From Swiss-Prot:
<dbReference type="Pfam" id="PF00581">
    <property type="entry name" value="Rhodanese"/>
</dbReference>
<dbReference type="InterPro" id="IPR001763">
    <property type="entry name" value="Rhodanese-like_dom"/>
</dbReference>
<feature type="domain" description="Rhodanese">
    <location>
        <begin position="127"/>
        <end position="221"/>
    </location>
</feature>
<comment type="function">
    <text>Catalyzes oxygen-dependent 5-hydroxyuridine (ho5U) modification at position 34 in tRNAs.</text>
</comment>
<dbReference type="Pfam" id="PF12368">
    <property type="entry name" value="Rhodanese_C"/>
</dbReference>
<dbReference type="InterPro" id="IPR020936">
    <property type="entry name" value="TrhO"/>
</dbReference>
<keyword id="KW-0560">Oxidoreductase</keyword>
<dbReference type="Pfam" id="PF17773">
    <property type="entry name" value="UPF0176_N"/>
</dbReference>
<dbReference type="InterPro" id="IPR022111">
    <property type="entry name" value="Rhodanese_C"/>
</dbReference>
<dbReference type="InterPro" id="IPR040503">
    <property type="entry name" value="TRHO_N"/>
</dbReference>
<dbReference type="InterPro" id="IPR036873">
    <property type="entry name" value="Rhodanese-like_dom_sf"/>
</dbReference>
<comment type="similarity">
    <text>Belongs to the TrhO family.</text>
</comment>
<keyword id="KW-0819">tRNA processing</keyword>
<protein>
    <recommendedName>
        <fullName>tRNA uridine(34) hydroxylase</fullName>
        <ecNumber>1.14.-.-</ecNumber>
    </recommendedName>
</protein>
<dbReference type="GO" id="GO:0016705">
    <property type="term" value="F:oxidoreductase activity, acting on paired donors, with incorporation or reduction of molecular oxygen"/>
</dbReference>
<dbReference type="GO" id="GO:0006400">
    <property type="term" value="P:tRNA modification"/>
</dbReference>
<feature type="active site" description="Cysteine persulfide intermediate">
    <location>
        <position position="181"/>
    </location>
</feature>
Length: 319
């Protein structure tokens, strides 16, 4: 690929057998550190799921090593150019699952999964009337961007999705089901679970939103907003033809695509808000979080009790 920026961000996953995840994680961390990569990689007996960043040379060496390991034969790397690292540190952690569904009877995507649709086929399928589009991501990811007409499951974590489906099964009955997520890993299991639950026509976006946005034919069309990513970039563009902002400021409801974490560490909720409202509301999602003695915004900006009281008074006066 033609390179114009000095760094790359790699997004990848693979369901494959890793006999000793703890040992692999320790060795892989040492290898990543030797290359001076930064990122977050999860390892389980069922495979690997990672995002990491580095220079073009560093990421080339990493991909070469992964491709030379027979366990990762056929692994696909989604590559974004970047001006610098997308992470502060390098973590490689062993986990019981790559994506946390916590099913009593786990899904093996090698044995059961939904039909793979390439971006063009997914685009065409979304336009059909007898189709329902399920976003397999969390609520805050959906709020920043999603496919037109997609259903937003009211969930805060992936493991809540099966229960949500069971409670809302009438939405799916008799429909062709399309599922999508950021890079595809969640849908490998989720679509397989849907098939096992008895839904007959289940498809998934192959390669996820990231691949859809880079596809030269569809160019991200039918996507509104941006795609939430789990690194310091927070959001990446998808639709190359038009940019429709769907995110709404937590405080005013105005169009917004800027995520911050609530300043109360005991809450830490992700909220969309402008820089102006971050300052006005002390980066807190509620009054309770604003007056928290551990409010990070107050501590970081060394605000006095008088300044906090004045800010609270101003908020109250504006109601």
């Amino acid at each position: 690929m033609a390179t114009t920026k000095p760094y790359r961000v790699l997004l990848y996953y693979m369901y494959t057998t890793i006999e000793n995840p703890e040992e692999f994680a320790a060795e892989h961390l040492a290898f990543c550190n030797s290359l001076e990569l930064k990122g977050r990689i999860l390892v389980a007996k069922e495979g690997i799921n990672g995002t990491c960043s580095g220079t073009v040379e560093q990421t080339e060496k990493y991909m070469e090593a992964m491709n030379n390991d027979p366990r990762f034969d056929g692994i696909v790397f989604k590559i974004d150019e970047a001006d610098g690292h997308a992470f502060k540190k390098m973590h490689v952690r062993p986990r019981p699952e790559l994506v946390t569904l916590r099913l009593e009877d786990d899904i093996n995507p090698h044995e059961i999964t939904g039909k793979y649709l390439e971006p063009k086929d997914f685009y065409e399928a979304m336009k059909q009337e007898d189709t329902v589009i399920i976003d397999a991501r969390n609520d805050y990811e959906f709020d920043l961007g999603h496919f037109k007409g997609a259903i937003k499951p009211d969930i805060e974590s992936f493991r809540e999705l099966p229960d949500w489906i069971r409670e809302n099964k009438e939405v799916l009955e008799g429909k062709k089901i399309l599922t999508y997520c950021t890079g595809g890993i969640r849908c490998e299991k989720f679509s397989g679970w849907l098939v096992r639950e008895g839904y007959e026509d289940v498809s998934q976006l192959h390669g996820g939103i990231v691949t859809y946005g880079k596809d030269p034919e569809v160019q991200g069309e039918l996507w509104d907003g941006q795609c939430y990513v789990f690194d310091e970039r927070i959001a990446v563009p998808v639709n190359q033809k038009e940019h429709v902002i769907v995110g709404k400021d937590h405080f005013t409801g105005e169009p917004c695509e800027r995520y911050v974490n609530c300043a109360n560490p005991e809450c830490n909720k992700k909220i969309l808000c402008s820089e102006e409202n971050e300052a006005k509301y002390l980066r807190a999602c509620s009054h309770e979080c604003r007056v928290s003695p551990r409010n990070r915004y107050v501590i970081q900006h060394e605000l006095t009790e008088e300044q906090v009281a004045a800010a609270l008074e101003k908020i109250e006066a504006g109601k």
